[in-house]
Amino acid sequence: VEAVERQLTEFFKINDEVAAVAEKVGGLLPREPYVPTSISEDVYQSIRFAQLEHCMVVLHGDAGVGKSKGAQKFLKDHPTNAVGISITPSTGTLRSCIKRLARALRVPECRNKMDQMLALRNRLDGTNQVIVIDEAQHLKYAALEEIRSLTDDNPMTGEHGIGVVLIGNSEVYSRLQGRQLAQFA
């Protein structure tokens, strides 16, 4: 009981401190979490383009310029036909990436990568979904190739693919343009 009381006391203390700081700087912070900039608006429109054209778009640039904020705004504005995931160095592998995507789409997890990709494809085929992957520079080559395949039309059903947007630093673009360009196409 004492341990729980200590944890609750600490929790409420931290909440009070956060509220006090927010009150002090409240006038300095924007009221809206999204402030449109030319870059964030370009990101927003590029995601829409990928969705409408069922293609892959790669958006890259320096950190802090508005790429992620534009993507977050799009995902908030289109909750039924857009899904976003963020990749980290530990989730850039094919297995981790498709597991994260399956969770975001509420597709049951499968035992192996092939079955998981088939389940994802079945869920996505014929929809106007767009997948937004932030921090895409962490994707390994196999994950990039599988994600790219989601834009392809399904040869078995004829259903069109979906839009995919990769957002990251310039490394993601360099990797696609570099020695793997011939393989990736």
List each language-model region with its residue ranges.
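Conserved catalytic segments around the Walker B and adjacent sensor/switch elements
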Residues: 78-90
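A short, basic N-terminal segment
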Residues: 1-54
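Mid-core helix/loop region of P-loop NTP-binding domains shared across ATPases and GTPases
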Residues: 25, 93-100, 107-150, 154-165
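A short helix-turn-beta junction within AAA+ P-loop NTPase domains corresponding to the substrate/partner-engaging
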Residues: 80, 178-185
